[in-house]
């Protein structure tokens, strides 16, 4: 960009930021971080798509900062699905190590402690490696008393399986006599979801141009507003983040009515 273009861009971004942050923001934003591999191939011209995953992890650090700045109380990100285990072993190992390193980093991050961000993994812990489990427990233990912001990282996560697990828990409660079958409600199922501590997402954002939900928070996003952008996750800019929030602010949420 030239000097004039840069100045115009900065002016527009500052104006947009002021507009967005002076209006009510979503309480809970969920993000499907998509496009890392295509970014590596098409933007970095790299044969090793893991470079795209590294850039994606770096972008997540930025987006967490943006959410704190905007006072968005809950951020949930789709880091690794149960289906991702079917990818090439080398890529799976790289991704899980990336998440492991991130968890240890979050546990020691001054920004996390200064802003009192609670870190939590949502997903099936029984199928992740022990070293990743230890890293998750480290971050969670270090932040368990915080409640200003919640940062949920979905790992080994599948929306359908989450619902099945919740139904099993409720069914067991009925079987044990702790609950009557007539007491089964949406709330009783929601209380058995991984995200039971948080409100449902107000805004679900997906990058890379794909128009699908990919088994992510399918119970919780029943009334969420959806926002899709063609931009690959590592290329996602602050101005794109602001545009997504503005789009949410301009909608009339009807909650199915």
State where each predicted segment sits.
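Flexible, compositionally biased loop and terminal segments
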Residues: 1-257
